[in-house]
Regions:
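Classical Sec-dependent N-terminal signal peptides that target proteins to the secretory pathway
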Residues: 1-5
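Acidic, metal/ion-coordinating pockets
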Residues: 7-318
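Catalytic centers of hydrolytic enzymes
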Residues: 16-29, 196-213, 218, 288-545
Length: 545
């Protein structure tokens, strides 16, 4: 358990705010019970002095609780989508936190959306939260160009651009301590979810990956946060400002730098696990997949000034076996996904290595056995309808979850299978078929590899069914350490001979690719835009194939 925080030299505390915070849960319902159990078993520390009138208790989610909400495929409740089941687990988690704080004590749950929360579009998300037991905060939304959100904000008290809480002093009933909570969503929706936000626009919306966003790209975002903070501080100079930022640490750091009146930023999006003090602003990041949560205590002194911010990190994995033994919790799990937990896939050890699948001539390169296996399976499936296909390309980010055997797990269930393509929303898993010449195909593959070498985590490598890439050789050529040419590092399987050979620049090839990759416009991705018109949408998705 890690402890971090800010403390002023004042000992007496007259009001307190307890926060349990999380982010980037990514719809991982299998690990949510362990977080619920962690909340239950640490409730006295998490919700310190919860019953006092001078204490407020919050449960905060800094984005991406959901992922691919429109996807279906459950066995227990086939009529339900991912989002329906994830929402059930959300309400259960909120109720767990509320009961841990004390059912009669002051409590609220606050949430700001992340990019994955919009995987099913804006209408799906806002319809769910219109009557949800949680306050949704949308500080950087452009209400003028967001008719759906604007209407909901005007008509629903639980949806707004900020929320202010009153915490009474423990001794002086006339003194009220103020806390404002804001929520900032990563604005690059044209990058993460192009075309899915029909009636919603965030300030500074762009098609840039957040790694490439600079201060000049976020001026309106900073301005709207500063405006709200300034108005609050004018009336409440001693008030505390908290920002739930699903932006990543780079942008959270920018907000802290430009708006030093912010006391605490609950950061999500970049899946980091660190705490950093930027000026007088404490930034707490939250990892992903329910691996840990944070317990935060904010205390006011006798004069109503901020006295202390203390944060602890609670790992949740050790509570997994305890959660499985909780009859009530397991009853809830079974109602939602019992049939989906039955083992469907088994790893068989044929080579002395439990994680290694039996290889055949469909496997090209040992960089990702699972990706190679799946791209080949998709290729075989699509060739039943489109026999002219030469190769299938899938960005590796789509394989957000793999099937990895270890000493703890060698069997996998329907939930595991459904999550294999969780790196892209159902709407954007559409595929396109195009016929391009060899020179264009070679440049497409090489550009992707070069961008991946610049940043492996930001620029996804495309996994191919019948194209062999020697990424290491490309790297050595770049350094001048090899006399080979790039053509030696990129080869395609010849349909007739089944052998790999250099891509022929004078030959045409038929390729199946991700709709999302072809639509993506980025400063570091050029070729897809040049060949996009040669691709046609087909009525298939990666899941259906």
């Amino acid at each position: 358990m890690q402890v971090s925080g800010i403390k002023n030299n004042i000992s007496f505390k007259s009001a307190q705010l307890n926060i349990v915070s999380t982010a980037d849960n990514h719809g991982d319902i299998l690990s949510m019970p362990q977080m619920m159990k962690a909340i239950q078993m640490n409730k006295r520390d998490l919700f310190e002095k919860a019953s006092e009138k001078s204490t407020l208790n919050l449960f905060a989610i800094a984005g991406d609780f959901f992922m691919n909400p429109s996807k279906k495929g459950f066995l227990t409740n086939p009529e339900f989508s991912n989002g329906d089941i994830q929402y059930n687990f959300l309400t259960k988690m909120v109720y767990t936190a509320k009961t841990a704080a004390g059912i009669k004590n002051r409590f609220d749950a606050v949430y700001t959306p992340g990019n994955h929360c919009f995987d099913g579009g804006d209408e799906w998300l806002f319809k769910k939260f219109e009557r949800a037991p949680i306050s949704t905060i949308l500080t950087n939304i452009d209400r003028t160009h967001s008719p759906l959100a604007d209407t909901l904000i005007r008509e629903n008290s639980n949806i707004g651009t900020y929320k202010v809480y009153d915490i009474p002093d423990s001794k002086n009933p006339d003194k009220i301590n103020k806390v404002m909570v804001l929520g900032v969503t990563i604005p690059s929706m044209n990058y993460y979810n192009p075309g899915l936000l029909k009636k919603t626009k965030f300030y500074d919306n762009s098609n840039k990956n957040d790694a490439y966003l600079e201060e000049r790209d976020l001026r309106k975002t900073v301005r709207v946060v500063r405006y709200n903070v300034s108005k609050f501080k004018e009336k409440n100079p001693d008030g505390v400002v908290i920002v739930m930022a699903h932006t990543g640490n780079k942008i959270s750091g920018l907000l802290a730098e430009k708006i030093p009146e912010i006391n605490l930023i609950i950061n999500g999006h970049d899946h980091k696990e660190f705490e950093v003090l930027k000026g007088s602003t404490l930034i707490l990041s939250h990892g992903q997949g329910n691996k840990f949560m944070r317990g935060i205590q904010i205390k006011f002194d006798d004069k109503g000034k901020l006295s202390e911010i203390r944060a602890r990190k609670y790992e949740t994995e050790k509570y997994e076996p305890i959660a499985r033994k909780d009859a009530r919790l397991q009853e809830f799990v079974n109602v939602n996904i019992k049939a989906d937990l039955v083992p469907l896939v088994y790893f068989k050890d044929n080579s002395g290595k439990a994680e290694e699948l039996v290889l055949d001539d469909s496997i090209r390169y040992s960089n990702n056995i699972l990706a190679n296996y799946i791209t080949s399976a998709i290729k075989r499936s699509v060739r039943l309808k489109y026999p002219e296909i030469d190769a299938v390309g899938i960005p590796s980010t789509i394989f957000r979850n793999g099937l990895k055997s270890n000493e703890k797990r060698s069997t996998f269930n329907n939930i595991d299978l459904m999550k294999m393509f969780d790196g892209v929303s159902e709407n954007l898993s559409q595929v396109r078929i195009g016929r391009i010449n060899g020179a264009e195909l070679f440049e497409l593959v090489l550009e992707n590899v070069q961008n991946n070498l610049k940043s492996r985590t930001r620029n996804a490598l495309i996994q191919w069914s019948d194209i062999q890439i020697n990424r290491s050789l490309v790297k050595e050529i770049n350094k001048g350490n090899s006399a080979a040419s790039y053509k030696d590092a990129i080869k395609i399987r010849d349909k007739a001979t089944r052998k790999f050979a250099p891509i022929d620049p004078n030959k045409d090839y038929t390729i199946l690719m991700s709709d999302k990759y072809l639509l993506k416009d980025s400063e570091n991705i050029k070729i897809p835009a040049m060949i996009r018109d040669k691709f046609e949408v087909i009525p298939e998705s990666y899941d259906s194939l």
